[in-house]
């Protein structure tokens, strides 16, 4: 009977004693007699208010949930910052490759014969008539823009964040699949040719893919793994169809023999260039190059015929180049990695350098040029 009067809410108990009169005796089949005793009466005061510790626990749970949400948000923001940074680097890399492709120039002459120019000028650098670096630039641009929008949580066209993440996952999957295929082409069809910038682009694509795998939960990946496989197959099939008529280029390092030839300099030298060349020679500056290197010839053209003769130029392959040919010992001792390379005051400088820059870094002035001309 007591259970009917006890509320489940928190109760305050006040103990007291109340005198209870003895009940009347009634005859029953079995008679019980109750003696005159004092029974403790327990008045129960019930309150509908929540206990104080309950009030304290609610804010603590809310605070814990808020802290957890904040940590997840910070982690996602950091991930999208990585996306944006890597995508930006990829845009710079492919923009430079696009410039090389459009102008037909080469980035830097390596010690071996194969260069980025060989790769970019091959049939494999074009996909359905579009230069491959241009496609790469667009893809990196999309990744950079999409990741930046995801980081801010402000996607266009009403796209949800979940759909944005899956779109990013799909794009990076396509990029990684294409990069894997290009590495296969580079190692088989373009064997012997090297392109550092192409390898950097492939590395960046794989990095973006692994980031997206980490960003998308395993359960979500299992839901779309079939779609991702189909996407990779479509990318590879499309590239194969585009390259069906492409012809592999011979390996410079193994299939071609380059006999040594003397390069002809067509430009004439100015008095300033002649004086600068003599100054560089006097301070021990050396230019290391190879006869096949177009950049080496362009550097000499800056000086002109007469001034180039005054330079301390070191030809690293004076006997020509073929498979097994070793670089000149002087070049090997100087640890030359590409052409042209300048060593000025023990400082290694790679690539072509403008005359004004050479003059500035060696302390050559116009007055010295005038003095040299007067002596002549």
From Swiss-Prot:
It is found in: Plastid, Chloroplast thylakoid membrane. SMART domains: VKc. Expressed in cotyledons, rosette leaves, stems, cauline leaves and flowers. Residues 1-45 form a transit peptide. GO terms for biological process: photosystem II assembly. Disulfide bonds join 109-116, 195-198, 293-296, 316-331. It is a multi-pass membrane protein. Changing residue 198 to A: Loss of function in catalyzing disulfide bond. Changing residue 230 to A: No effect on catalysis of disulfide bond. InterPro entries: Thioredoxin-like_sf, VKOR, VKOR/LTO1, VKOR_sf. Keywords: Chloroplast, Disulfide bond, Membrane, Oxidoreductase, Plastid, Quinone, Redox-active center, Thylakoid, Transit peptide, Transmembrane, Transmembrane helix. It comes from the Eukaryota. Its EC number is 1.17.4.-. Changing residue 109 to A: Loss of function in catalyzing disulfide bond. The chain crosses the membrane at residues 82-102, 126-146, 166-186, 193-213, 224-244. This is Thiol-disulfide oxidoreductase LTO1. The gene is LTO1.
